Amino acid sequence: MMTKAFFNKLPFEVFRRYVRTGKSIPQRSPRTRKSLLVGGTIASAVVLYNFNDTFHDSVKHTALTTKRIAVVTQATTRCFYHYKRALNKSYENKKEREVALNKCHKMCALITLHALRSNGGIYIKLGQHIGAMTYLLPKEWTDTMIPLQDHCPESTYEEIDELFKEDLGTSIEDMFLEFNKTPIGVASLAQVHVAKLKNSDGKGSSVAVKCQHPSLKEFIPLDVMLTRTVFELLDVFFPDYPLTWLGDELQSSIYVELNFTKEAENAEKTRHYFSKFKKQTALKIPKVIESHKRILIMEYVGGKRLDDLEYIDSHGISRSEVSSCLSHIFNNMIFTPNVGIHCDPHGGNLAIRSVKPAKDNGYHNFEIVLFDHGLYRYPSTRTRRLYAKFWLSLLFDKDQTKMKKYAKGFANITDEQFPLLAAAITGRSIDAALNYDISTSRTQEEMDVMANGILEGTLLSDLMSILSRIPRVVLLILKTNDLTRHLDECLQNPLGPERTFLIMTQYCAKTVYDEKVERINSEYARWSIKWMWENLTNWIVYERRINQLYFYDFVLWWKKFIPKTWLSS
């Protein structure tokens, strides 16, 4: 209980008493004045923190900002230290160096994982991409990042409710008949809840409600700045490994992904386009019901992860058929003019569900569900055509001179950088890529050579130099290729990668054929002798390629499914 003596000693009581009596206020010693100043400041801060919302929010923001900066700084410093130590140390033999580097990879990957999880948001997205780069990064890094695909930090129900009140002016309870407080999926930028909308019939329809993490609004500018700073520091300490381009790409794409109205537009456009290709793709894109900048309401479509082999096998779904549909989906996006490319097809953004074969699913017994349409890119027609010609030169013509010519055209590289780019595009070793030996599955030995060899000599610095030169839209095409290649490997397709390469070659051949038709129509009068001859020649070349591909596909199927005893006899 506060006593009268206590109140009489408060500064304002002392001042009031001396004014009333006319006596002068005695001078305090410097030490006493300093104590009073510090105490007064602390007391004022406590009062403001508890009773002034603006001051409270400022202090809280400063504390959280300091924490995020500290997490990034500490993780970066520790990784720098461990790698500097491991790379500069002398080893008795190559095996000892390899073991030491593997330990360093694992240690730094765990440090990074902890930092990414601690800060969440765009850091999770960085970790997801690291986890998908199996063709490039050591196994210790990619395996460590796998949990980030669908085990991300979630926002509380109270935070989501505040988001609805702030953005829509209504609470969750007022808008929905039912709302599951536990999200069915949590990603780096948002989480999804199952709910039932209030309908006029009083029953309610099941929907998926995608809610952006509220904290992103406050910290995205800071996080973008921090990641750019980290990459710039890497550039200072490791000038041979330029990574500032990654920070630039993150800054240019993250704000697009955070606008859910743009995602709704991409989803509806893609859903409408692929409705014509159900037989080839079995693709299902949830219909958008309502969209806002930070809230997206869609039809609810359930499913399992695409790499859930137990679910696939138990429902009688063909792995090779799923792999083929995946290949059709993303090659259609990459090679068809004016069609957007989904640039984030990692395991958490794809699902598979068992259905009854019908016309609206292409008579498949499954559907591939594609989520998260926030980031799409539209490469120029020239880029798509050069990219198609590169693959035809590799897979069909087996002509390294042509490969180099087209790679320089779409990737802005030098002759010396071509071998490494070929390996990066194909996800194979340099020898395999340049010897046209990429249609067979990667062996464990090849993957080990690629992962461990990346730190030998100047290979890693050369690769980073290439990535810093490549146009951003081409980088996103390569990223999409990386992620779909990783998914295909997870499916353990019994037909191997040969089938997916055959499908891609069909799209490449059609792209080149369409380009020649366009050129012929612009150069010659329609129905002239020359026009008809050029079109006939172009059609014959195209049909010959397609028929060869069909024959290879048949042979592949025959070798896989016809009993070996028949083949031997």
UniProtKB/Swiss-Prot annotation:
The record describes its membrane topology as: Single-pass membrane protein
Q: Transit peptide residues?
A: 1-18
- Keyword Ion transport carried by entry: no
Q: Would I find Membrane among this entry's keywords?
A: yes
Biological process per Gene Ontology, one example term: mitochondrion organization
Q: What UniProt keywords are attached to this protein's entry?
A: Membrane, Mitochondrion, Mitochondrion inner membrane, Transit peptide, Transmembrane, Transmembrane helix
Q: Which domain of life is it from?
A: Eukaryota
* Ranges in the topological domain labelled Mitochondrial intermembrane: 52-569
Q: Subcellular location, in the record's words?
A: Mitochondrion; Mitochondrion inner membrane
Q: Which SUPFAM superfamilies match?
A: Protein kinase-like (PK-like) (SSF56112)
Segments spanning the bilayer are: 35-51
Q: Which residues lie on this side of the membrane: Mitochondrial matrix?
A: 19-34
Additional detail? Present with 1600 molecules/cell in log phase SD medium.
**Family to which this protein belongs:** Belongs to the protein kinase superfamily. ADCK protein kinase family.
Q: What is this protein called?
A: ABC1 family protein MCP2
Lineage of producing organism: Eukaryota, Fungi, Dikarya, Ascomycota, Saccharomycotina
